[in-house]
Amino acid sequence: MARVCNFSAGPSMLPEKVLKQAQAELLEYGDSGQSVMEMSHRSKWFDAIITDTEATLRRVMNIPDNYKVGFFQGGATQQFAMVPLNFMTTGKADYIVTGNFSNLAAKEAAKFGEAKIVASSKDRNFTYIPDVNAIDYDKDASYIHICQNNTIFGTQYVELPQVEGVPLVADMSSMILSKPVDVTKYGCIYFGVQKNVAPAGMAIAIVRDDLLGHAADTVPTMMNYTTLLAKDSMYNTPPCWCIYMTGLVLKYLENDIGGLAKMQEINEAKAKVLYDYLDGQDFFKNPVEHRYRSTMNVTFTSPDPDLDKKFCAEAADAGFVNLKGHRLVGGMRASIYNAMPAEGVDKLVDFMEKFRKENA
């Protein structure tokens, strides 16, 4: 059976070359005589895997030496609690709410202190990003939190909030590794890996050194960043398979794609094809303000919810799967992460045009 074009928002596509390498090494990794899924996390083979994965991430993202990198269980949702537990030293933090996940992060933080929503785009159903330069930030806030790309609503930041002395914390789950990022602009970057990096089951956090070591003694051991980071992500058994797969994807980005600048060029070209089509006809609509349109997650609707259902069903039959929009938005959503080939987007546009002609 031919592989489908998978537009899932996550878990999502992985590069076929990476899958084939994992397949080839599934029963025996190197000369270990065992699968990565079986080996001890204290073995010399896995020690080499986790060390190389972190080193490759540092190269690919140009992460400075004064930042720690950690591989965490629990996904990005666990980070919603870890961030305030570790960083809310003044008892308050600023949150910009631009979608479901930033809202959930703010709600979680409110359990541990004052999580002030200083700006929100809820008034227009999260179809834009608030002007970060017009926000009244609290200079005594422990940090400013954003979700840099909004998976559900299809928006992304084009400018970052910058307040002197207040660290920026960003959830980058649905845009990480899609383009170069200046890590030095952030105090902490975290992301679930299941959208653009690896299979589900892990989050990665990149934390500036000066933010560590301030958690209260009452913070649970496994919710304290310092616990894991001081032990190079090996305080307890880490998500070994996810770390291995992350390493394969990073090597693919570095060696086959040519780095994040090249990946950005490819991604923007893919998104342009889809947005140009949406703007060139009147059947399908994208609700997002042009300036804030996501490169990774493209939302659209047809003239009628019943047609949306018909579109998704016929698309699946044609090999385009997981296009149904999130229940908060409806319609359709095409997640075109790094692993989605340009040909997949081209074929989707052809199918959309065919559907339009048959149903307009």
Cite the ranges covered by each PLM segment:
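PLP-dependent enzyme catalytic core of the Aspartate aminotransferase-like
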Residues: 2-4, 330-360
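A glycine-/small-polar-enriched, mobile loop at the entrance of the PLP active site in fold-type I
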Residues: 3-54
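Active-site phosphate-binding strand-loop segment of PLP-dependent enzymes
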Residues: 10, 109, 120-176
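Conserved N-terminal alpha-helix of the aminotransferase class I/II PLP-enzyme fold
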Residues: 33-79, 86, 100, 108
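PLP-dependent aminotransferase-like
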Residues: 77-142
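Active-site C-terminal subdomain of aminotransferase-like
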Residues: 188, 193-275, 289, 358-360
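Conserved PLP-binding catalytic core of the aspartate aminotransferase-like
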Residues: 284-314
